[in-house]
Amino acid sequence: MSIVIGADAAGLRLKEVVKNFLEKENFHLVDVTAEGQDFVDVTLAVAAEVNKEEQNLGIVIDAYGAGPFMVATKIKGMVAAEVSDERSAYMTRGHNNSRMITMGAQLVGDELAKNIAKGFVNGKYDGGRHQIRVDMLNKMG
C-alpha cells in the first residue's frame, strides 16, 4: 500500500508535516506535488496514482479542502471525503471505503492534520451493510 500525497501552494507546508509524520510511521509515501499546480491538477495526479493499486490511499491538502473534494468526486470510482477531524477520517474508511481525503491547511493545525492522516490510513473498511452504499457510489459518474 502506498499513501499518495499532494498539495497546491496553500497546502505545501502542511503536506510536508503530514508526509514526514507518515514516513516516521513507516508508511510508503508517493508525493505527486509539482510546483505551480493548482488544486485541480494535484487532485487529478493523486487520484491517478491512487487508482494504480486497489490498496493505495490519497491525501490532498489545499487551503480549505473543498476544491480537491469536488474534483475527486468527479472521478469515476473515486470515493473521497473532505475532513477536518480525526473521527471523520477514520469513519470514512470504515463506512464509505474512501480512498482519498482532502483537508484544508487554513482549517487544521499540524497536530490535528497528523491525527487525521493517522485515522485515515489506519481505518479499515467494514463492508457488510455499508457495501450497498459503496456500490451505489461506484455506479455514479
UniProtKB/Swiss-Prot annotation:
Protein's organism: Streptococcus pneumoniae (strain 70585)
So what family is this one in?
Belongs to the LacAB/RpiB family.
Q: Supply the enzyme class, top level.
A: isomerase
Protein's GO biological process: D-allose catabolic process; galactose catabolic process; lactose catabolic process via tagatose-6-phosphate; pentose-phosphate shunt, non-oxidative branch
Q: What PANTHER family does its record include?
A: GALACTOSE-6-PHOSPHATE ISOMERASE SUBUNIT LACA, RIBOSE-5-PHOSPHATE ISOMERASE B
Looking at the record's lineage, which domain of life comes first? Answer: Bacteria
Name of protein: Galactose-6-phosphate isomerase subunit LacA
What this protein catalyses is: aldehydo-D-galactose 6-phosphate = keto-D-tagatose 6-phosphate
Pathway of action: Carbohydrate metabolism; D-galactose 6-phosphate degradation; D-tagatose 6-phosphate from D-galactose 6-phosphate: step 1/1
Enzyme Commission no: 5.3.1.26
Q: Which gene encodes it?
A: lacA
Q: Which InterPro entries match?
A: LacA, RpiB_LacA_LacB, RpiB_LacA_LacB_sf
Return the HAMAP family for the record: LacA (MF_01555)
* Keyword terms: Isomerase, Lactose metabolism
Share what the entry says about its subunit structure, partners included.
Heteromultimeric protein consisting of LacA and LacB.
Q: What would be an example GO MF term here?
A: ribose-5-phosphate isomerase activity
SUPFAM superfamilies hit by this protein: Ribose/Galactose isomerase RpiB/AlsB
Question: Pfam families recorded for this chain?
Answer: LacAB_rpiB (PF02502)
